Amino acid sequence: MNGLGREQCESTAPVFYSATVVVREMDSPSLDLRPFKIMQFPFTPKLVTQIREGYSAAYFRKDALAGLTVAIVALPLSMAIAIASHAPPQAGLFTAIIGGFLVSALGGSRFQIGGPAGAFIVLVASIIDAHGMAGLMLATMMAGVIMVVGALLRLGSLVRHVPHAVTVGFTAGIAVIIFASQIHDLFGLTLAAPEPGDLVHKLKALWQASPTANPWAIALAACTIAIIVAIRTWRPLWPSLLIAVVLASTAAWALQLPVETIGTRFGGIPSMLPFPSLPSFEGQSLLALLPSAISLAVLGSIESLLSAVVADGMTGRLHRSNAELVAQGVANILTPLFGGITVTGTIARTATNVKAGAHGPISGMMHALYVLLFMLLAAPLMSLIPLAALAGILALVAWNMVEKKEILKLVHWGPLLVLAVTFLVTIFRDLIEGIAAGIVLSLLLNWLAPRRQS
């Protein structure tokens, strides 16, 4: 059985999280290393599966390059999400490093990239405003425990029953949200006030700021997209994202272009990772934080598992839902100890990982190590990257996330209606509400179908 076939069989079986323990049989005084018994414990990470299948230097080169590409995107994005969430920028970096490493090392998806997510901005900001950073850390750790319990109850497998139209609509909605979040940097706009979170007010504010558009930023973003598309067309084996970022950064630095960079937007990058410590939870009420913890757990579980489903669709692989849920839970329990915020699998960075040619979870682990390395050694160089170039990359990622072929396959009005409702509720209301609306509508249509026929 080849690697893909084995992975599919393991994914559909009722697997548990498993570390593999090797027990040597010693039935005689002589030492015999040949007979081994493999004992499986629940929830095998995909990292273990990959190692069993064999891991070559060629695979490592693919993962190292993909991890570097994702890290280049994740570094400013993690800081920006943290700032928008009312947390210090280094909290986003710590989340990408610790949470990203744990999600990839322990997760049930080969390609999942963990870190801070834009979907959590409003929820995380409201928790920090009400309970402070200590309250967020406690709520995040509680959410992690809830995720692990959910995995033990096999709730992660429920994502397999989410209708395909809901997944396609949700993914398209996320793509629109991601693209909208990049318009500011794509056009080099200067906003008079902080950028609103909801789509309608965001687009209104961006339109009002349109006279401030920076032609140099627009040119850099357009050139970045053009370089990536050209390389993927004529030299598909070349690292298109990395080359585009290096060329854009070099041009902006050499020509002294008046565009925002990581350095001008975010200031200095932290140069060390804090020692893990338990923050003071004095005055924090577990009962008061429980609703927030449940919301974090539900949203994190849904986004992570749907992100894994998206990666499955892009690669033909199958993830292990409950193993992924355990990894997300462990990451959310441990990341706050390093000063991080809530962790989840992120569709944009996961899609970037796949598009960059990742082979397996080591790319996600490398992405975390690269972010740490940049934080320790390469802060001055990283500060030169134009935000317009990164916005161009994410705009292209958002475009590629929309499953256009899958949308065209939905020829019946029922699935199309489910897709449209999921998409619209996701972009105009809330991610969880979008998924819930799509599932409820799908169930309703399935319930009404036999009655219409009779």
Label each region the model flagged.
Residues 20-22, 84:
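Juxtamembrane/membrane-water interface recognition
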